[in-house]
Amino acid sequence: MKILAISDTPSKALWDYCTRERLQGIDLILSCGDLPKKYLEYLTNFTSAPILYVHGNHDGSYRHDEPGGCICVDDEVYVWKGLRIMGLGGCIRYNRDEDAYQYTEREMRRRVCSERKQWEVILNNQPPL
C-alpha cells in the first residue's frame, strides 16, 4: 500500500511536472489541509487514487467551494481497503477568525472521542494532540 501525504505548500514537482507516470503506484492521496482547491483538483487529472482531505485552518474558502473530485473526511471515519481513517481538520484556536477551521482543545477532544467507530489513522491538519 503506497500513500502520498500532502499538506500546506503545493509541491513544485507535482504542480509543474505532474504526469500519470509520476503518480503511478500511489494507492491513496491524503491531504492534511491548507492546499489550494485548484491544486487538489489538478491532481485528480493524473491519478485514479482517491484523494481524501481535511480542512486546514486556512481553508475558509472551502466552506462555499469544496475541491471537486476529492473526498472530504472531516469529522468522519472513512474506510479504504479495510484501513479506517478519521478526518480531524482544523487546528487549535489561535485567533477569532470565524471563517477559519479553529477549535478549542475541548472541542477537538470531543471531536475525537465522539466518533464511536474505531480508527487506525488520523488525517490531521495540526501537529499531534
Feature locations, PLM:
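N-terminal active-site segment of His-dependent metallophosphoesterases
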Residues: M1-F46, K117
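Conserved catalytic scaffold of divalent metal-dependent phosphoesterases
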Residues: A5-A13, H55-L129
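A short helix->loop->beta-strand "cap" motif at the edges of active sites that frequently abuts
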Residues: T47-I51
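A short beta-strand/loop micro-motif in the catalytic core of glycosyltransferases
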Residues: L30, L52-V54
